[in-house]
Amino acid sequence: MTMPLADLTVVEVSSFVAAPLCGLTLSQLGAEVIRVDPIGGASDVRRWPLAASGTSIYWTGLNKGKRSATIDLRSPEGQELIRRLIVEGDGVVVTNAAGLSWLSFEQLATTRADVIHVQLLGRGDGSTGVDYTVNAATGFPLVTGPANQAGPINHVLPAWDVCCGLYAALAVVAAVRRRDQSGVGAKISIALEDVALATAGNLGWLLSLIHI
């Protein structure tokens, strides 16, 4: 059976949860996803929990089914190789790497106008934020935990990373469809904080808390 994204190649320059989950989701839909890591591995390559062999179960779970490329991201030659993987491939990149001007939409669009660039952020203004800090900032710890506990309790599920990764995968699918129809690329930014606030609004949890 032909998978929905069987003819699509996606380059993923990422680490941790949201962006790798986006790539994993696209891979499970049939896309060829190339996970790019720096030499020695990204900061999540040995993240707990570890198997007896020392391999990160976490990393393996989020990157199964992908191709892997280890490239020197600091060298001009390595940066050019990654750009070529993107622009000479299907022109789709997903990243949560910040501050890499050579990997920006603007830079890639100079050689491929219809590039689809998806950037995952902590916060919409570009400042840092991870799942548990965003969760605390949005007020969700006030509505999680035991009913008899008055104080805020953070949950253990990286919910906003997961939601953000799935939203990002949907954004790629939508952008590819639009490009197929119009030839237009896309610059897409998705922030964990925005995802959390949008989800809170949709579920009405924080409003319910006010009424309580």
Q: Where is each model-derived feature located?
A:
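N-terminal helix-loop segment corresponding to the beta1-alpha1 unit
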Residues: 1-181, 210
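Substrate-binding/catalytic subdomain of NAD(P)-dependent oxidoreductase enzymes
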Residues: 176-209
